[in-house]
């Protein structure tokens, strides 16, 4: 291989020298032998040298192939990802453009090396991005004008940055509508196939906390996903304040007057509320209102799952009720650890056997509160339920009808209930066999509503319907008030009152110090 690389003239000179050496004598023969030995050594070294150069050539080819693959990946990345990372949606902006690719090939006697040179040309953006000094202003302006959003490159991937971190309200409302639609489809496929009408019975009367309680209840009822009629029985006759509150609900309202006024004694109030509920049941029977009857007091708290459970009742059902009896006032004595452990579970509801049928009732134990309960409305003491509360029962309205298809024999006639003037404590008085009650809420294991009685004093002053007609009187002046003359008068009055209070405090301090000194003198 080395010979093939030598020029032809050198080959001729070598051949002539070899022929001259052969024609020489004995000394020349020995020299020829030496020359032949040297030629043989050169011939032995020639294959090793050619192998070395062949391997070196192959190694250089592999290196060039690897580098060419790497450069091709870089070229592919620059061509197809530069626009996505650095370009903007504005037509006036421009991105990095690959202008030219120069390939230089250098050939030597041993190998061929290819060098790829990439030339990138960038054009200035006529609309540069906003500086970091005014990020919020620039982002707001960009969002309002519909300009491009900035990008941050991490490695080979771009991270999109919103012009403002808050979500788009249109997208939020669209997501809410999608979720609402999904929930409707889930209820349609997996919920109640044929939902029944819900009849909610609420006794109420005009008082300080009526607006508070009715507002909370009406918002709960508005979220019920079933057809609903709200039957409100008002003690002392219907009032405009109650009617205006009920009109805000956008529900089907039946506002019924009750002739008796609500008493201020808790025991009498419980009895009056029971008669009001019984009056509502008679109205339901007279109008033949079909549905499921739920007794929802205005001060109770209801779970929406309750209205799903009542759809399962056949004639009369019962749910567990949480009793919130503690007032939490500052003067209430703290309970010891032993009393806390012995405190009864504040739950009223059905108790089931192993087969899931009604076996009895779990009632609220009021013995630990003996002598500590409130007797008058507004008194700062615990208010306890009397026996089983109506709120824990659910009725099928057809149980009240005189003639109903499939009405069981263990149901009493509504006209026979309370005809002798006996007190009606709970709906079980409507049944001849109370064991036929159906336990709901996973056999009473789920608490679906909470019984609570929170009331203001009977003589408390409050605006009618909590609507303030005249402007409020200024009690404490503001630092910057639009009535400077009133502020001056009030400031003077406040200063005088503070001086009077300070004088009284000093006089009490003087009297106490004098009494201490007199006592010390007597002891001495």
Swiss-Prot record:
Subcellular location, record wording: Golgi apparatus membrane
Main location: Golgi
Keywords: Cell wall biogenesis/degradation, Glycoprotein, Glycosyltransferase, Golgi apparatus, Membrane, Signal-anchor, Transferase, Transmembrane, Transmembrane helix
GO biological process: cell wall organization; glucuronoxylan biosynthetic process; plant-type secondary cell wall biogenesis; xylan biosynthetic process
Ranges of biased composition (kind: Gly residues): 24-41
Glycan attachment residues as annotated in the record: 132, 135, 240, 353
Membrane topology label: Single-pass type II membrane protein
Gene Ontology CC: Golgi membrane
Cytoplasmic side: 1-51
Record field: transmembrane: 52-71
Lumenal side stretches: 72-524
InterPro entries named in the record: Glyco_trans_43 (IPR005027), Nucleotide-diphossugar_trans (IPR029044)
Transferase among keywords: yes
Disulphide bond pairs: none
EC number(s) on file: 2.4.2.-
Gene3D superfamilies: Spore Coat Polysaccharide Biosynthesis Protein SpsA, Chain A
Pfam families reported for this sequence: Glyco_transf_43 (PF03360)
Gene Ontology molecular function: any one: galactosylgalactosylxylosylprotein 3-beta-glucuronosyltransferase activity
Biased composition (Basic and acidic residues): 495-513
Region Disordered, annotated ranges: 21-41, 492-524
Described purpose of this protein according to its UniProt entry: Probable beta-1,4-xylosyltransferase involved in xylan biosynthesis in cell walls.
Family: Belongs to the glycosyltransferase 43 family.
Protein name according to UniProt: Probable beta-1,4-xylosyltransferase IRX14
Gene, per the UniProt record: IRX14
């Amino acid at each position: 291989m080395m010979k093939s690389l030598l020029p032809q003239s050198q080959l001729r000179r070598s051949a002539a020298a070899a022929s001259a050496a052969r024609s020489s004598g004995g000394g020349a023969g020995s020299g020829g032998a030496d020359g032949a030995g040297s030629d043989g050594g050169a011939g032995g070294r020639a294959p090793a040298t050619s192998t070395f150069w062949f391997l070196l050539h192959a190694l250089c080819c592999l290196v060039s192939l690897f580098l060419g693959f790497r450069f091709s990946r870089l070229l592919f990345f620059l061509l197809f990802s530069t626009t996505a990372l650095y370009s903007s949606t504005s037509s006036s902006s421009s991105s990095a453009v690959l202008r030219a690719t120069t390939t230089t090939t250098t050939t030597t006697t041993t190998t061929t090396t290819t060098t790829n040179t990439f030339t990138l040309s960038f054009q200035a953006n006529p609309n540069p991005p906003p500086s970091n000094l005014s990020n919020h202003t620039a982002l707001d302006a960009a969002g309002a004008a519909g300009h491009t959003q900035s990008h941050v490159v991490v490695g080979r991937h771009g991270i999109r940055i919103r012009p403002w971190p808050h979500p788009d309200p249109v997208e939020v409302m669209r997501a809410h509508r999608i979720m609402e639609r999904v929930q409707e489809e889930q209820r349609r496929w997996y919920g109640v196939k044929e939902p029944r009408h819900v009849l909610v019975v609420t006794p109420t009367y005009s008082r300080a906390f009526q607006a508070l309680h009715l507002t909370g209840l009406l918002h709960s009822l508005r979220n019920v996903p079933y057809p609903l009629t709200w039957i409100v029985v008002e003690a002392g006759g219907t009032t405009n304040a109650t009617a205006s509150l009920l009109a805000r609900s956008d529900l089907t309202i039946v506002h019924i007057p009750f002739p008796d006024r609500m008493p201020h004694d808790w025991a009498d109030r419980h009895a009056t509320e029971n008669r009001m509920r019984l009056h509502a049941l008679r109205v339901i029977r007279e109008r033949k209102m079909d549905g499921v009857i739920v007794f929802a007091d205005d001060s109770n708290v209801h779970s929406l799952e309750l209205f799903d459970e009542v759809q399962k009742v056949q004639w009369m059902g019962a749910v567990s009720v949480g009793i919130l009896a503690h007032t939490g006032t500052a003067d209430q004595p703290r309970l010891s650890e032993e009393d806390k452990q012995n405190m009864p579970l504040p739950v009223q509801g059905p108790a089931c056997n192993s087969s899931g049928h009604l076996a009895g009732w779990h009632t609220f134990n009021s013995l630990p509160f003996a002598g500590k309960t409130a007797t008058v409305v507004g008194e700062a003491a615990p208010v306890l339920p009397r026996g089983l509360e109506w709120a824990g029962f659910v009725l099928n309205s057809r149980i009240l009808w005189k003639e109903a298809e499939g009405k069981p024999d263990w149901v009493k006639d509504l006209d026979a209930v309370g005809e002798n003037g006996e007190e009606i404590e709970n709906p079980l008085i409507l049944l001849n066999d109370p064991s036929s009650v159906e336990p709901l809420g996973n056999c009473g294991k789920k608490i679906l509503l909470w019984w609570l009685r929170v009331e203001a004093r009977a003589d408390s002053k409050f605006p009618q319907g909590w609507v303030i007609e005249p402007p409020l009187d200024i009690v404490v002046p503001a630092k910057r008030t639009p009535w400077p003359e009133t502020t001056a008068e009030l400031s003077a009055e406040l200063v005088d009152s503070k001086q009077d209070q300070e004088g009284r405090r000093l006089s009490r301090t003087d009297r106490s110090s004098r009494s201490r000194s007199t006592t010390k003198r007597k002891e001495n």
